[in-house]
Amino acid sequence: MFCVQCEQTIRTPAGNGCAYAQGMCGKTAETSDLQDVLIYTLQGLSAWALAAREHGIVDSEIDAFVPKAFFATLTNVNFDSARIVAYVNQALTYRQQLAAKLAPLAVQADTLPAAARFEPGADLLAQLAQAPQTAVNRGKNEVNEDIMGLRLLCLYGLKGAAAYMEHARVLDQQDAGVAAEFHRIMSWLGTDPSDLDPLFKCAMDIGLLNFKIMEMLDLGETTAFGHPEPTQVRVTPVPGKCILVSGHDMVDLKLILEQTKGTGINIYTHGEMLPALAYPFFKQYPHLVGNYGSAWQNQQKEFANFPGAVVMTSNCIIDPNVGNYSDRIFTRSIVGWPGVTHLEGEDFSAVIAKAQALEGFKHVELEHFITIGFARNALMQAAPAVIDKVKAGEISHFFLVGGCDGDRAERAYYTEFAKAIPQDSLLLTLGCGKYKFNKLDFGDIGGIPRLLDVGQCNDAYSAIQLALALSEAFECGVNDLPLTLVLSWFEQKAIVILLTLLALGVKDIRTGPTAPAFLTPALLKVLEEQFGLKGTTTAEADLAEILAA
């Protein structure tokens, strides 16, 4: 096992990365090694998909499958070895189909990269035996640590882009050009590139690709559900039977709401599903009563205390046996945990039956509401008033503080930072990092809330659109605005969001609570020199430096 993709990975003087029987996330060495086999097999499949495109053969099913299966290897997504083996076998089937179509066109495997010729084992044990040749750090003794770090930066960034591609696909947003670029990068990374400049360029290409994907996802969500609007959301429960929907998939939320009409079951969002409550479409369901809990890392306590059924529509899942709720949590799509019921289709009757059999909430809790819904359209509508207040000196600065949440004690930095920003500044937030401060009262500036919840992590697209609108209004570049980005990272979606911002030329971003363990000191120095990227220190010191600039 070798895995170094998330913020909680093991760090030692001897080297970084989880490399024992189990990773810090709970992923076993077996599952980790199988995921490496899957990734290499997918890189080979992408090579075949590229070759097919050269002959006018485009298979939209394969275009959808590769990023979806790649998504299964993200942090806290799929811990079920049998499911990973099934993805490998499906990838091989698709590859054989493409090879059969290309054979009459004289396209042979020996003309393609080595990954395209890789033959995965027929079963779990056979695939495990192949792990050394497919490990994500294969060839580590043949290249320096900077090359390996850049390979991993690109691989993990592309994982994040793959996740957003799958989220967009669920909303009927697919693009052949985006898929072709994804296959190109996926295939190239499978060749184990060893030159610094092409790898840096690849990282920027991934960032630009992801910007297009975020645009597709934004279009898919707003077409299906309308534009989010400022909305007050209840964050305390009400009496009644209940289902909790976590993850990111609003289509699953829609299906659950439809299938629970008239049942008396209340539906709650959790984690990154909170922004769904701001979409006009979901306001037609009175039994969507609010949001429960906070960010992913608290689920073992929060799910244990939730007296109903839980559905994980995407990341993040952690061991449900710790809180003894594995019999009432259900997984969907790419999510998996051994022994947990997985729902293959769109029938949620098993979830409904479980909710009806459970106690539900018995008591009324004091009402507590928070305001959400400041995504792209709402921000654009508010922009003229914001611009006027900037010109009048009523708003001095904009802070975007958000990203991933996590367990590390140092993440208290984000709460402290949010509390400490000047009263004449606006605080934008997105991702589950918002839970560090989104239940605090920040007041308003002339009727404009100081805390503006932009949405899910992918709604960084909305924040970028606001920055572009402000730069146009003030006739300056984005980097000349009184705008500071302070991001928290945990996994690969955050990595690709960062690559997107860097590829768009955004500078002087601060990230924390730690630097990714796969980035060497030399690579971090390059990122600081080229982009002004800095690590967080203390809220007081960082804020003083920002305001003095």
From Swiss-Prot:
Residues bearing the modification Cysteine persulfide: 404
Any one GO biological process: response to hydrogen peroxide
GO molecular function: 2 iron, 2 sulfur cluster binding; hydroxylamine reductase activity; metal ion binding; peroxidase activity
Catalytic activity: A + NH4(+) + H2O = hydroxylamine + AH2 + H(+)
Binding of hybrid [4Fe-2O-2S] cluster, residues: 248, 272, 316, 404, 432, 457, 491, 493
GO cellular component labels: cytoplasm
Pfam annotation, one family: Prismane
Residues that hold [2Fe-2S] cluster according to the record: 3, 6, 18, 25
InterPro entries reported for this sequence: HCP/CODH (IPR004137), Hydroxylam_reduct (IPR010048), Prismane-like_a/b-sand (IPR016099), Prismane-like_sf (IPR011254), Prismane_a-bundle (IPR016100)
Coiled coil ranges: none
Keyword RNA-binding among record annotations: no
The protein's Enzyme Commission number: 1.7.99.1
Cofactor(s) listed: [2Fe-2S] cluster; hybrid [4Fe-2O-2S] cluster
Keyword Oxidoreductase: yes
Function according to Swiss-Prot or TrEMBL: Catalyzes the reduction of hydroxylamine to form NH(3) and H(2)O.
Family label: Belongs to the HCP family.
Name under which the protein is recorded: Hydroxylamine reductase
Annotated organism of origin: Aeromonas hydrophila subsp. hydrophila (strain ATCC 7966 / DSM 30187 / BCRC 13018 / CCUG 14551 / JCM 1027 / KCTC 2358 / NCIMB 9240 / NCTC 8049)
